[in-house]
């Protein structure tokens, strides 16, 4: 009797889809989309649109939202001067600044694995501010130059913090503590510039140091927008690279991921974004601290969602500036005063909760 053995049927192993994700097909390719993060992103987009319309409506003279929509859609309106020329440029600058701070905070906190690793806490914003204020006291006040000086100051401060914190790896707690030390030192340098400079220039620089959107127009909005558009490809890469950074170092090394270079690239992008935003509006404190952690809690994801963090940062800045304009009208408050009033208690809460990093935990392999 002859027995016939059947050849085993080879089957391609099915890809395991993580819980909470949906596979979205786009042409021949596909990608995973976190359902809750997508819903939160849509909700934040709607919220940002609503806050923006309210921002353009409320002022010395109230303009109905219907007229605001008419102006934004390009239709003729008697309120075109107030909405399109006076309020819209300032709102756009605030929106772009919030987007930049939101992404910058998310990237730096992801690399450091520490919710306190915010650009305005670890010295990056202070470095950008010190060089910018120093230039202002020596007569450089052109917005065509100040953002680039701000980027240079932020990158230099970040490089110093990175070098001093590196001990065979980037220890999260050491990174934050050394950054705080540099932030204090750089604030002292900024104060020195303010005391040695011309009185009127020092007064202007002091307002800028609190974080202010007062007087911002299209001359500031246009270069800021183009800079952020130029950084968009890097931001898309960062959204993909976040997953590799969150891996265990041994796992990433086994998969051949150049973890050190990826982390360095993410930090550099975060520093540039924070410095550009600082150059445009001054060091608006705590936006980069608040937005990533709130976005993560809203989406309940393992990594900080970049898009949600960016949108939330924009909502925070635009809404805070709306309150800053109207709370003590006709006197305007710097937007940084409002964000600090919310961010400082949140920072205290983080420290009390003990979320300053675990001993022995590092955030860097070989760089």
Language-model features, listed with the residues they occupy:
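Alpha-helical transmembrane segments in inner-membrane proteins
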Residues: 2-367
